[in-house]
């Protein structure tokens, strides 16, 4: 090339900052220049570009985290269906495989020191929670548990309610000494289990004589019911759709009390009477399987101990349990739960102003059976009696309905 022509090209800015292929390198572009290039892109086009950049470039992922992690509701998970002997350390060990944890806790019974059947996990980054939710059903200590966003609460649609009713089965005559994992291994042969077995005593960890399983598909439940009588270790177990229990009209669901607790309270997944106030109390009452009434609570988030920090519709009725007369479901109930105004202690208690009164949980729900349902071979509560002491209105649960 003539030297005079080359000098003129250089003076006009050509031939500078090339990447070897004759094109101008990106270092000459300012952020404003880049914005002008993409500002006419559609949302889908921008998402396509950004998702590839997040996966390929760690610095882009960190930038996205700075914005996404500010919403704790997308990082906090609720895990239900835990065994009585599941510990915080075990929960942390499992979920830390998905990402760095800010907090993990199994909620314990203050009397027995054992798991109440649920816990919370908060990830440091939203992508850790996202990975953990890819498979919501996780086998932990012989149980298939369910993981969900804590903020999602009880927000099932009508179609979801109908769908669950066709996937949930009730198993009667379960031997008291049959381990949960033995029962689970048998029923997993019919299809993928979403949750179960439910119904084991929270204190002893033993069967109460029945169990519940929720399959991921209705076909799995139907396969399990093709032969309604199962023989496991020489014992005959009777199976049916759990929803059928609402049609029988037989009085008296089983009302088994805590084995050896000596407190007269009914604990555990299946039996769902009012539970004693505990250290995780909230003004609206967190019913037996936890739950948030109303909108997000206005409590402080100053510490990492914020497992109860995201409010929503609650874990109440959607998985309501076997509420007998005056009883509340195990996954929720009328104002039942861990304390009302002035009750509870410890770092997880919410201020009374953070939640509306009145509880807000139906007596039973998609995982529950009506108080009129009856199954053979179970312990029945005598009509007109209750293992739970009645408290005058305005007593233990001043915001709840009468007799709570």
From Swiss-Prot:
Coiled coil: none annotated. The gene is UBA2C. Residues 1-29, 246-270, 344-404 are annotated as: Disordered. GO terms for biological process: cell death; defense response; ethylene biosynthetic process; leaf senescence. Induction: By wounding. Heterogeneous nuclear ribonucleoprotein (hnRNP)-like protein that acts as a component of a complex regulating the turnover of mRNAs in the nucleus. Binds with high affinity to RNA molecules that contain U-rich sequences in 3'-UTRs. May function in complex with UBP1 and contribute to the stabilization of mRNAs in the nucleus. Plants over-expressing UB2A1 display severe growth defects consisting of premature cell death and chlorosis. It is found in: Nucleus. It comes from the Eukaryota. The keyword Nucleus applies. GO terms for molecular function: mRNA binding. This is UBP1-associated protein 2C. GO terms for cellular component: nucleolus; nucleus. The keyword Cell wall biogenesis/degradation does not apply. CDD domains: RRM2_NsCP33_like (cd21608). Keywords: Nucleus, Repeat, RNA-binding. Pfam families: RRM_1. Residues 75-152, 167-248 form the RRM domain. Signal peptide: none annotated. Expressed in root apical and lateral meristems, young leaves and embryos.
